[in-house]
Design a protein with these regions (language model features):
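Glycine/small-residue-rich interface belts in oligomeric ring/scaffold proteins
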Residues: 1-41
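Active-site helix-to-loop segments that bind/position phosphate- or nucleotide-bearing substrates
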Residues: 39-270
């Protein structure tokens, strides 16, 4: 076991030599230490964060998410009329978000988009819809796992730049909720959705892998590595895209550019 003195010496050496941050993570990307360069004292960035009180960045982020939801549906090979209808409706909702809307109006469009998107994304399985965190079926549990992994990697990148991850631009600030992480990961969620649809088709994700306790579904412990593996693979295919998006968002926020210059995260075309 490494002594505290030796650890401190190696840690200090790392901070001097390494010109870039090294994030130590768990298997689900949860950060437990950042070594090397980080901008935790970036007071100017945080002042910009706290001064911002508009709705336009959140509106653009939600527009970006709906655009990627439509692309995720386009990536499905066999397109039924039901699927094509959903793509068109999502495209129309993107256009609605070009207008300057109030927060509740944006929330309404986001909710309508979800009701169109999720039944079509998971039309390959009997499913009662997206219900976050209540674990009422195996698809929702798998989505929660994937979103948590995505959340953790975005959190790590935002920490490196010195953002106050608890202070968002769209999600309301609640005690101990990392609202900015929730904001920035929004356009990336379809990465997880599309991968889980593929896993359902390939038999990688199935009801037999779960136990049910008091109507709450839980992934069997021995199945954890398999699920983490296919979800991690999908997220890491976008590691460069995620890094560049956070980097561009940082530069955008520091320069306080027009909302039209807000970076866009794009889902890959298949």
């Amino acid at each position: 076991m490494m002594s505290l003195d030796v650890y401190s010496e190696k840690y200090g050496l790392c901070r001097k030599i390494v010109g870039f941050p090294i994030c130590l993570m768990s298997t689900t990307f949860k950060v437990y230490e950042v070594l090397g360069a980080r901008m935790e004292g970036n007071t100017l960035l945080r002042r910009h964060q706290y001064d911002y009180a508009g709705d336009e960045i959140g509106r653009k982020i939600e527009q970006n998410k709906i655009r990627n939801q439509a692309q995720a549906l386009r990536n499905i090979r066999r397109k039924t009329e039901y699927l094509k209808e959903g793509i068109q409706l999502l495209d129309d909702m993107q256009m609605q978000l070009e207008a300057e809307l109030e927060y509740l109006e944006v929330m309404g469009i986001e909710g309508n988009a979800a009701r169109i998107y999720f039944p079509r994304m998971f039309d390959n399985v009997q499913w009662n819809g997206r219900k976050p965190r209540i674990k009422n079926d195996y698809v929702n549990v798998t989505l929660d796992i994937g979103y948590t992994m995505l959340f953790n990697i975005v959190d790590a990148m935002l920490q490196v730049y010195g953002f106050d991850t608890y202070y968002g631009v769209f999600h309301k600030c609640f005690y101990m909720r990392k609202s900015l992480v929730c904001d920035i990961m929004e356009p990336m969620r379809p990465i997880v959705d599309y991968e889980i649809r593929k896993a359902l088709n390939l038999g990688q994700c199935k009801a037999e892998d779960f136990d049910v306790y008091d109507q709450r579904w839980c992934l069997k412990y021995k199945k954890n590595p398999e699920y983490i593996q296919f979800l991690m693979k999908a997220i890491l295919e976008y590691k460069d895209d995620i890094f560049l998006y956070v980097q561009q968002y940082y530069r955008y926020f520091m320069k306080r550019k027009s909302v039209e210059e807000l970076p866009v995260f794009l889902l890959h075309k298949v």
